[in-house]
């Protein structure tokens, strides 16, 4: 692992250690930090709680990470993410944004990319779309509303259909 990737991983693990056990466990298991990623259901079954309760615990932990990391070297990841998002009109798919941050900061690809995803979710200036079928998860600034994104998507589909440059998929 490169020095930058190791530094990020170590800083992230230090921040995780300041969370309560259940928050830390849920986040580690969700992102696959130690083993494979686990679903909300798998984690919920372990604790005897619902998927929704696991999601709530994860959200609380991520918000705490956001507060804690303001004084850590990990802030540069959020700063890079905000800068890149600004250059791309305030909205970008999660995968493209994470890849752009990796390139911008010069992180080796052997870092668990979901660490960057969690750090972006912890950024109070960014919002993450809810996972939906047939769409990519994306990050955006608060002023870029879901309604605006859907309107642009709808208009782009119309233009592409008119040009015959779209492949229809059956639902």
PLM segments and residue spans:
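C-terminal non-catalytic scaffold/interaction domains in large multidomain proteins
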Residues: 1-171
């Amino acid at each position: 692992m490169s020095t930058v990737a190791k530094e990020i991983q170590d800083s992230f693990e230090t921040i995780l250690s300041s969370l309560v056990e259940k928050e830390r466990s849920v986040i580690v298991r969700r992102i696959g930090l130690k083993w494979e990623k686990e679903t909300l259901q798998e984690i919920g079954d372990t604790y005897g709680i619902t998927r929704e309760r696991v999601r709530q615990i994860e959200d609380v932990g991520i918000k705490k990470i956001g507060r804690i990391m303001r004084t850590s070297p990990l802030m540069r990841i959020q700063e890079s993410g905000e800068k890149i998002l600004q250059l791309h009109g305030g909205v970008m798919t999660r995968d493209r944004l994470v890849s752009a941050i990796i390139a911008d900061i010069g992180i080796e690809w052997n870092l668990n990319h979901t660490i960057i995803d969690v750090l972006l979710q912890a950024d109070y200036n960014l919002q993450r779309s809810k996972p939906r079928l047939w769409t990519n998860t994306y990050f955006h600034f608060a002023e870029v509303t879901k309604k605006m994104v859907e309107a642009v998507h709808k208009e782009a589909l119309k233009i592409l259909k008119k040009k015959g440059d779209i492949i229809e998929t059956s639902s």
